[in-house]
Amino acid sequence: MPRHESAKKRMRQNEKRQKRNKSQKSRVRTKIKTLRSLDDKEEAEELLNDVKGDLDRLAAKGIIHENKAANRKSKLEKHVDALE
């Protein structure tokens, strides 16, 4: 356990940020799973735009790496393009 006040504060801040980041990543993962389960191309395209924005937002905030966001967007676009 930290002894200094600043270390205690840093620990509290890290826990708070970890919870926020985890919930944001979980929300995006849920949207991705929903997108992959869709069979209708129009619905999938609408959700794809939403997911792409979320991935860009996470990458901009440093929650996920920019390349990881780009790779996920690319794979999801291929998936939606393959739908009929």
Swiss-Prot record:
GO cellular component, one term: cytosol
Keywords assigned: Ribonucleoprotein, Ribosomal protein, RNA-binding, rRNA-binding
Pfam family, one: Ribosomal_S20p
Residue numbers spanned by region Disordered: 1-32
Molecular function, one GO term: small ribosomal subunit rRNA binding
SUPFAM superfamilies (UniProt xref): Ribosomal protein S20
InterPro entries: Ribosomal_bS20, Ribosomal_bS20_sf
GO biological process terms on file: translation
Entry annotated with the keyword Ribonucleoprotein: yes
Source species, domain of life: Bacteria
Family statement: Belongs to the bacterial ribosomal protein bS20 family.
Function: Binds directly to 16S ribosomal RNA.
HAMAP family: Ribosomal_bS20
Name of protein: Small ribosomal subunit protein bS20
Organism: Salinibacter ruber (strain DSM 13855 / M31)
